């Protein structure tokens, strides 16, 4: 996921619900890789319960009713779904901006041209090391790095912009500058770093999760590093970056405006249930792909109704529902903490962000 600039349009729907800016749609869970951090624990074989072409198109028909969302076609690897370009073309014809997050290994010149023709605006490719040895070890398949680099070349040839996504782990922290240099060299338009969420296969990567203090260091480094390049840099699943950005900007006497910080000045950290949602391969709507919280199924309830009325989404939209230090925190509206990490580390999706070291000025809830 993550292949997206921020969507545009009004902030609320006619009933007062927030507009949905982004939908990550897991059009298939099948994948040809075996990544150590995969939230879906995906495998090659087809999964039962995936949508037919007609069902998928009927779902697409409902998306404009929640705003003008960007649709992220994700997986698994979305390229393992045979009708994916037909679905993208259908969504594009509806006026929806479509982006895609393949792993890159399956992209051929023909696939890249079909992406372009169907309306794919951007691809995100995950690269977790600056070379084959480090990336392939994380991705679980020898040759994955070389295949992804080749696929990226085909995207370039087809005129499709791409971004690189990198998951932060203890093993690759020391390689971040080299990964960025790789992004520059291959022509990426953006580099998004993802803080590891311990779900799916990543639940077994406890030794790779860095501490709250280390995350603070990484995100401060990221804040400084973004000043050195014109490439768009974004911290994802790292809502506390938006606190750090404001703290640092205040220290430097810089206003947090789009002119100074781009779209980072206009969005918040965790968008789950407030501007973003995830739809699984079987139709379950979730706040995000890392938080398997059942907010309703589009096979039983129209998607716009789920977006507007889900009790879980209502919680995420109400500051008083947050417990621990996230509720009273003065940075709540721009951060919100990672709900998936809260759930996976405490069992409570409304608990405080476990990998944040900040202590709010007050610790009593806002009532």
From Swiss-Prot:
Its cofactor is [4Fe-4S] cluster. [4Fe-4S] cluster binds at residues 31, 35, 38. CDD domains: Radical_SAM, SPASM_MftC-like. GO terms for molecular function: 4 iron, 4 sulfur cluster binding; metal ion binding; oxidoreductase activity. It catalyses: Fe-coproporphyrin III + 2 S-adenosyl-L-methionine = heme b + 2 5'-deoxyadenosine + 2 L-methionine + 2 CO2. Pathway: Porphyrin-containing compound metabolism; protoheme biosynthesis. Keywords: 4Fe-4S, Heme biosynthesis, Iron, Iron-sulfur, Metal-binding, Oxidoreductase, S-adenosyl-L-methionine. Its EC number is 1.3.98.6. Pfam families: Fer4_12, Radical_SAM, SPASM. It is an enzyme of class 1 (oxidoreductase). GO terms for biological process: heme biosynthetic process. Residues 15-238 form the Radical SAM core domain. Belongs to the radical SAM superfamily. NCBIfam families: rSAM_ahbD_hemeb, rSAM_more_4Fe4S. Involved in siroheme-dependent heme b biosynthesis. Catalyzes the conversion of Fe-coproporphyrin III into heme by the oxidative decarboxylation of two propionate side chains. This is AdoMet-dependent heme synthase. It comes from Nitratidesulfovibrio vulgaris (strain ATCC 29579 / DSM 644 / CCUG 34227 / NCIMB 8303 / VKM B-1760 / Hildenborough). The lineage of its organism: Bacteria, Pseudomonadati, Thermodesulfobacteriota, Desulfovibrionia, Desulfovibrionales. The gene is ahbD.
């Amino acid at each position: 996921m993550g292949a997206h600039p921020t969507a545009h349009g009004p902030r609320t729907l006619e009933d007062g619900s927030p507009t949905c800016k982004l939908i990550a749609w897991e059009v298939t869970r099948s994948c040809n890789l075996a990544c150590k951090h995969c939230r879906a624990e995906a495998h090659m074989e087809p999964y039962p319960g995936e949508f037919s072409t007609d069902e998928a198109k009927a779902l697409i028909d409902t998306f404009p009713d929640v705003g003008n969302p960007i649709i992220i076609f994700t997986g698994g690897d979305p390229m393992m779904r045979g009708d994916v370009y037909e679905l993208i073309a259908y969504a594009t014809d509806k006026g929806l901006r479509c982006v895609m997050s393949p792993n890159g290994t399956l992209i051929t010149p023909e696939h890249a041209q079909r992406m372009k023709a169907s309306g794919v605006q951007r691809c995100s490719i995950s690269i977790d090391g600056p070379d084959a040895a480090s990336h392939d070890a994380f991705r679980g398949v020898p040759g994955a790095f070389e295949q992804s680099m080749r696929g990226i070349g085909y995207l370039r040839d087809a005129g499709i912009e791409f971004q690189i996504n990198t998951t932060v782990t203890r093993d690759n922290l020391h390689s971040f500058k080299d990964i960025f240099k790789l992004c520059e060299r291959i022509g990426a338009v953006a580099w998004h770093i993802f803080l590891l969420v311990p779900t799916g296969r990543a639940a077994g990567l406890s030794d790779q999760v860095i501490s709250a203090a280390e995350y603070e260091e990484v995100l401060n480094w990221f804040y400084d590093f973004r000043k050195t390049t014109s490439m768009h840099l974004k911290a994802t699943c790292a809502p506390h970056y938006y606190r750090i950005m404001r703290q640092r900007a205040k220290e430097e006497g810089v206003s947090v405006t789009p002119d100074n910080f781009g779209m980072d000045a206009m969005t918040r950290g965790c968008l789950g249930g407030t501007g973003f949602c995830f739809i699984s391969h079987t139709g379950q709507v979730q706040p995000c792909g890392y938080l398997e919280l059942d907010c309703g199924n589009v096979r039983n309830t129209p998607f716009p109704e789920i977006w507007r009325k889900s009790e879980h989404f209502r919680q995420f939209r109400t500051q008083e529902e947050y417990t621990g230090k996230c509720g009273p925190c003065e940075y709540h509206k721009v951060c919100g903490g990672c709900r998936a990490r809260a759930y996976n580390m405490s069992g409570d999706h409304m608990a405080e962000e476990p990998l944040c070291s900040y202590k709010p000025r007050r610790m009593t809830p806002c009532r």
